[in-house]
């Protein structure tokens, strides 16, 4: 089955639906054939039923099975084998049922020659029904609803105007009951409800035109009300089953009938009936009982062709088990014979539980038959490669495997070696089928050659042994400096594969251990070397299928080699695929590989892009924290891995090209090799330039120091960048928040302040963590190196005599921290001397929903009373010193659960103290407290809650707010008139806050299962906390009004 792609950006919507029946087939632009297919189906959506469709992108090798699979997968259908694909001509009654093995491109070429593409309509339909299909479909709700919509549509189009009035009324009322199942049984008794159904929805959606035209409006209304009451207690599923029960006597939707003739020479005109209950039967007269011909389990082969007479009728031949001669059916045309053959073949596949077709197609003139596959002895299998290909291989890998000379054999020498020449050493790794050991091979050329030895755990059976040796059979094809070389095999039990030893182990572990010592040029070098190996494989027309850092071995510090060629053979075994689903590298695989098990050179390009990302991330695995089942959803929603720190924009742009959803838009390995070579040369040139600048600075420092023992000056203030470039690039939190990873234009400059802030302040590091879905720890960020300004003289010699270099750096960092804290203290002093210290709305502006002060991400709001002008606030304590950090008990931010790694603990936040009033019977105070509690409860539950639970939680907050506002309305008349305006403004602000919370909730539901879901959850928390804070402000306003009223009533 070839790959097809459901394009989320092209989904059909009501606004873009066609007004006529034209434009429903293949779309194409002038001069080029667009690989886009519009497929109509009966999966319900919010639009009109006539516009239910999916837009599918497909490749040249896509077959009909791939199109069907893609659509039904998105609806979680169980009975996939029941679905068929129909092509209809809109200007005639021409209908073609497309077999699942037909290629979509060949279908277009064939039928668009006869009619323009806009005159064709592609439909997904349920055609093949199992016995007792309704009972089976009740366990598969998407299929049951699909079949109901299909049958209802056929009924309305074909026979609705001919059925009895009572049946039409019942069927129409059952559809009303199903559509509005929450509606009470007597709801249509009310005139307003009936008018909504009649005018807004339209009765023609439920009843045939003949009934609406023949019955007066008042009479029809009474008939509908009476009939609807009969089904008042049915739920949706019961309404569907009742619909089928009433319709089946007048319309046999469970079988298809064809007017044809039995025999070829002496023929009998009959009506052939094909269905799950009858099997293959025929009727000679309408009133007679059907005569059974055969069951689907008896059909062995199906053939069809044109008859040899002048009428060119279609001939269908069925080879039936136990019958002396084939059953011959003469159809009016070859098209009808093809449609009958597809129907019988679909039923045969369904009842036999196989995807193998029973149709034998005649060999066309000019086609050559495939050669027979020779059966080789074991000794022959060891010495040579056979081109025997299983059926599953030809289906999945038609673009890769060829009957011609696919591989160039490097040599014909025998790879079998003697076991006594191998000295088995310690185990250095564990594989899927066995362990890997270090060893010594005593060859004639080298008596002590270090080798790696793969052993097989369970190689007693021939099948396991052959699968294990397949990797050796594959590796012997290649001779490349960056591909692990095969040295030999031992085919006798226990089976061993001997390969060259890469002493530094697998690349992923190597990157993790050496991440602080490897520079960017080395990382790009590894990617480039892998691209040369994969370009070599591409030239050999070979697909690796498991490109990942764990399968790359490090031969030396400047040489890596691609290994592990075993998965390609194992993936071809469908039984192994199903049994070992968890072992598939889902997070590295291309979307067409995940969906259809289709592996091509383009899917290798995708995996290589992920492998490059791993290298740049120093061995971090992709999509950490994401379930395998959720990966394909994120990819199809446009999400890609983020740009790694220190990654050049040109390299990340190249990665994103590797991750194009359409395989045809991905670059080839030859292009990747050339572009990586260019990027590597650029990085080497930049590295040399940095080294020259560094050496000049060192010389300047040594020349200018003059033996001074003065302590080094403090680094420059934040916001005044140093001329010196940082050693690497580390994005700021603002850049890390970007969810569109294709945007590389936000690549910041090379000033050292960004890297410095990321390492000095743990709070900043946590901000990086919380926006990164893959939980990179702040320890991965390199330590800040002190900036040395050109105008500053730093005596390294004098310092070195007193302090070691690392202590000197710690002193510089401590001075930088003190300078930052001094700056914050001055800002706070200036702010606190202002007359209005009321809590600012800026305290809820943080993205993670936690409360903070109005100054910025690092400045937490400090509540104080009126400061004494003679005594400014105390200077804040040094980091690590005991302070009065706390959290607001009533408004603690649960959004911290989004943050992974180091948590940024908010300091205590409290508005100006509440007035000292008697609260014993204060309804406003009680309701404000109730609202705050509702916000806290919602905040504690929102993180793990599914989207359908958002509405009840927000509803509780809304009810608490409504109660509060009603209480305030009762209190306002008792307060001075001069305060009413301020109270009303505070009430409006609360209503606005609730509206904002509802909007954020809708966005969080809309973008569920995407990279934006967490972002909108955070915004929900932010809106909820704003609501709670403004409720407290409303209480303060009312308290001030009460105090004012008390002041006016006091005697003077």
Curated annotation (Swiss-Prot):
Membrane topology type: Peripheral membrane protein
Maturation and modification: Phosphorylated on tyrosine residues upon activation, e.g. upon integrin signaling. Tyr-397 is the major autophosphorylation site, but other kinases can also phosphorylate this residue. Phosphorylation at Tyr-397 promotes interaction with SRC and SRC family members, leading to phosphorylation at Tyr-576, Tyr-577 and at additional tyrosine residues. FGR promotes phosphorylation at Tyr-397 and Tyr-576. FER promotes phosphorylation at Tyr-577, Tyr-861 and Tyr-925, even when cells are not adherent. Tyr-397, Tyr-576 and Ser-722 are phosphorylated only when cells are adherent.
Reported tissue expression: Detected in B and T-lymphocytes. Isoform 1 and isoform 6 are detected in lung fibroblasts (at protein level). Ubiquitous. Expressed in epithelial cells (at protein level).
Catalytic reaction equation(s): L-tyrosyl-[protein] + ATP = O-phospho-L-tyrosyl-[protein] + ADP + H(+)
E.C. no: 2.7.10.2
InterPro entries: Band_41_domain, FADK_N, FAK1-like_FERM_C, FAK1/PYK2_FERM_C, FERM/acyl-CoA-bd_prot_sf, FERM_2, FERM_central, FERM_domain
Active site: 546
Disulfide bonds: none
This protein's UniProt keywords: Acetylation, Angiogenesis, ATP-binding, Cell junction, Cell membrane, Cell projection, Cytoplasm, Cytoskeleton, Developmental protein, Isopeptide bond, Kinase, Membrane, Nucleotide-binding, Nucleus, Phosphoprotein, Transferase, Tyrosine-protein kinase, Ubl conjugation
Entry-annotated residues carrying Phosphoserine: 29, 54, 580, 722, 732, 843, 887, 910
Phosphotyrosine PTM positions: 5, 397, 407, 570, 576-577, 861, 925
Residue numbers carrying Phosphothreonine: 13, 914
Segments of this protein annotated with the region Disordered: 1-27, 684-734, 839-922
Disease implication from the record: Aberrant PTK2/FAK1 expression may play a role in cancer cell proliferation, migration and invasion, in tumor formation and metastasis. PTK2/FAK1 overexpression is seen in many types of cancer.
UniProt record similarity statement: Belongs to the protein kinase superfamily. Tyr protein kinase family. FAK subfamily.
Subunit structure: Interacts (via first Pro-rich region) with CAS family members (via SH3 domain), including BCAR1, BCAR3, and CASS4. Interacts with NEDD9 (via SH3 domain). Interacts with GIT1. Interacts with SORBS1. Interacts with ARHGEF28. Interacts with SHB. Part of a complex composed of THSD1, PTK2/FAK1, TLN1 and VCL. Interacts with PXN and TLN1. Interacts with STAT1. Interacts with DCC. Interacts with WASL. Interacts with ARHGEF7. Interacts with GRB2 and GRB7. Component of a complex that contains at least FER, CTTN and PTK2/FAK1. Interacts with BMX. Interacts with TGFB1I1. Interacts with STEAP4.
Protein name: Focal adhesion kinase 1
Annotated source species: Homo sapiens (Human)
């Amino acid at each position: 089955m070839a790959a097809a792609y459901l394009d989320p950006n092209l989904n059909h919507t009501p606004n873009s639906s066609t007004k006529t029946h034209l434009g429903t087939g293949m779309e194409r632009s002038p001069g080029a054939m667009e690989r886009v297919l519009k497929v109509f189906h009966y999966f319900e959506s919010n639009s009109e039923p006539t516009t239910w469709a999916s837009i599918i992108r497909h490749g040249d090798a896509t077959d009909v099975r791939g199109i069907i699979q893609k659509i039904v997968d998105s609806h979680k259908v169980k009975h996939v084998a029941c679905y068929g694909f129909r092509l209809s001509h809109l200007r005639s009654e021409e209908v073609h049922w497309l077999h699942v093995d037909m290629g979509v491109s060949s279908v277009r070429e064939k039928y668009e020659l006869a009619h323009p593409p806009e005159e064709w309509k592609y439909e997904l339909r349920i055609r093949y029904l199992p016995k007792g299909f309704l009972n089976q479909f009740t366990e598969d709700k998407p299929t049951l609803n699909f079949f109901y919509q299909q049958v209802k549509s056929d009924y309305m189009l074909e026979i609705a105007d001919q059925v009895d009035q009572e049946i039409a009324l019942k069927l129409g009322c059952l559809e009303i009951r199903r559509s509005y199942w929450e509606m009470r049984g007597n709801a249509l008794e009310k005139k307003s409800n009936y008018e909504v159904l009649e005018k807004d929805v339209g009765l023609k959606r439920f009843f045939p035109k003949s009934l609406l035209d023949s019955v007066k409006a008042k009479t029809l209304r009474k008939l509908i009300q009476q009939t609807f009451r009969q089904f008042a207690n049915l739920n949706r599923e019961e309404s569907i089953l009742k619909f089928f029960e009433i319709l089946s006597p007048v319309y046999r939707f469970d079988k298809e009938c064809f007017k044809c003739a039995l025999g070829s020479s002496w023929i009998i005109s009959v009506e052939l009936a094909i269905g799950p209950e009858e099997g293959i039967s025929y009727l000679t007269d309408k009133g007679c009982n059907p005569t059974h011909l055969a069951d689907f389990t008896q059909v062995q082969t199906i053939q069809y062709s044109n008859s040899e007479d002048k009428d060119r009728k279609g001939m269908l031949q069925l080879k039936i088990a136990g019958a002396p001669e084939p059953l011959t059916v003469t159809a009016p045309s070859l098209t009808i014979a093809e449609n009958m053959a597809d129907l019988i073949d679909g039923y045969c596949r369904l009842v036999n539980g196989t995807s193998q077709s029973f149709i034998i197609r005649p060999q066309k003139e000019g086609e050559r038959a495939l050669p027979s596959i020779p059966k080789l002895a074991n000794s022959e299998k060891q010495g040579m490669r056979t081109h025997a290909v299983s059926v599953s291989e030809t289906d999945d890998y038609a673009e890769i495997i060829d009957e011609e000379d696919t591989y160039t054999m490097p040599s014909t020498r025998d790879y079998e070696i003697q076991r006594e020449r191998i000295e088995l050493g310690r185990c250095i790794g564990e594989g899927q089928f066995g362990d890997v050991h270090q060893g010594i091979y005593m060859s004639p050329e080298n008596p002590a050659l270090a080798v790696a030895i793969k052993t097989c755990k369970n190689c007693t059976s021939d099948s396991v042994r052959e699968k294990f040796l397949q990797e050796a059979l594959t590796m012997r094809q290649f001779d490349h400096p960056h591909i692990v070389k095969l040295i030999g095999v031992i085919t006798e039990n226990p089976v061993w594969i001997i390969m060259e030893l890469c002493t530094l182990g697998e690349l992923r572990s190597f990157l993790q251990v050496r991440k602080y010592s490897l520079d960017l040029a080395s990382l790009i070098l590894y990617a480039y070397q892998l691209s040369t190996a994969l370009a070599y494989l591409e030239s050999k027309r070979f697909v690796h299928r498991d490109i990942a850092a764990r399968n790359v071995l490090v031969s030396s510090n400047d040489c890596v080699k691609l290994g592990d060629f075993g998965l390609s053979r194992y993936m071809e075994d469908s039984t192994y695929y199903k049994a070992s689903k968890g072992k598939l590298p889902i997070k590295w695989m291309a979307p067409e590989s995940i969906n259809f098990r289709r592996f091509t050179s383009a899917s290798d390009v995708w995996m290589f892009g992920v492998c490059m990302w791993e290298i740049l991330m120093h061995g971090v695995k992709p999509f950490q924290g994401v379930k395998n089942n959720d990966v394909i959803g994120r990819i199809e929603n446009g999400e890609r891995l983020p740009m790694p720190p220190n990654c050049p924009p040109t390299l990340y742009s190249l990665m994103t090209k590797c991750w194009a959803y359409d395989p045809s838009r991905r670059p080839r390995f030859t292009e990747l090799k050339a572009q990586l070579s260019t990027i590597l040369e650029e990085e080497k040139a930049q590295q040399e330039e940095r080294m020259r600048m560094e050496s000049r600075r060192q010389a300047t420092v040594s020349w200018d120091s003059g033996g001074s023992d003065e302590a080094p000056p403090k680094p420059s203030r934040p916001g005044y960048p140093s001329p010196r470039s940082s050693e690497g690039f580390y994005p700021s939190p603002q850049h890390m928040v970007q969810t569109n990873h294709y945007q590389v234009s936000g690549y910041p400059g090379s000033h050292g302040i960004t890297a410095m802030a990321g390492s000095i302040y743990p709070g900043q590091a946590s901000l990086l963590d919380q926006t990164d879905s893959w939980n990179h720890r702040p320890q991965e960020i390199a330590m800040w190196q002190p900036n040395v300004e050109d105008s500053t003289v730093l005596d390294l010699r004098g310092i070195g005599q007193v302090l070691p270099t690392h202590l000197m750096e710690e002193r510089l960092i401590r001075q930088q921290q003190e300078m930052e804290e001094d700056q914050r203290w001055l800002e706070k002093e200036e702010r606190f001397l202002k007359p209005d210290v009321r809590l600012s709305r800026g305290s809820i502006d943080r993205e993670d929903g936690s409360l903070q002060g109005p100054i910025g991400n690092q400045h937490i709001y400090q509540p104080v009373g009126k400061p004494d002008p003679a005594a400014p606030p105390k200077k804040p304590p040094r980091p690590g010193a005991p302070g009065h950090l706390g959290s607001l008990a009533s408004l603690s931010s649960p959004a911290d659960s989004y943050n992974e790694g180091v948590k940024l603990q908010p300091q205590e936040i409290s508005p100006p103290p509440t007035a000292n009033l008697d609260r014993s019977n204060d309804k406003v105070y009680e309701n404000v407290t109730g609202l705050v509690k509702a916000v806290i409860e919602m905040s504690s539950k929102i993180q793990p809650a599914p989207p359908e639970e958002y509405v009840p939680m927000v509803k509780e907050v809304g009810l608490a707010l409504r109660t509060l506002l009603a209480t305030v309305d009762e209190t306002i008349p008792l307060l001075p008139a001069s305060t009413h305006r301020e109270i009303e403004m505070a009430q409006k602000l609360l209503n606005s806050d609730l509206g904002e919370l509802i909007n954020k909730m809708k966005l969080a539901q809309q973008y569920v299962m995407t990279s934006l879901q967490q972002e909108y959850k955070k915004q929900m928390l932010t809106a909820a906390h704003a609501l709670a804070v403004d409720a407290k402000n409303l209480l303060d306003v009312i308290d001030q009004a009460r105090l004012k009223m008390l002041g006016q009533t006091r005697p003077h």
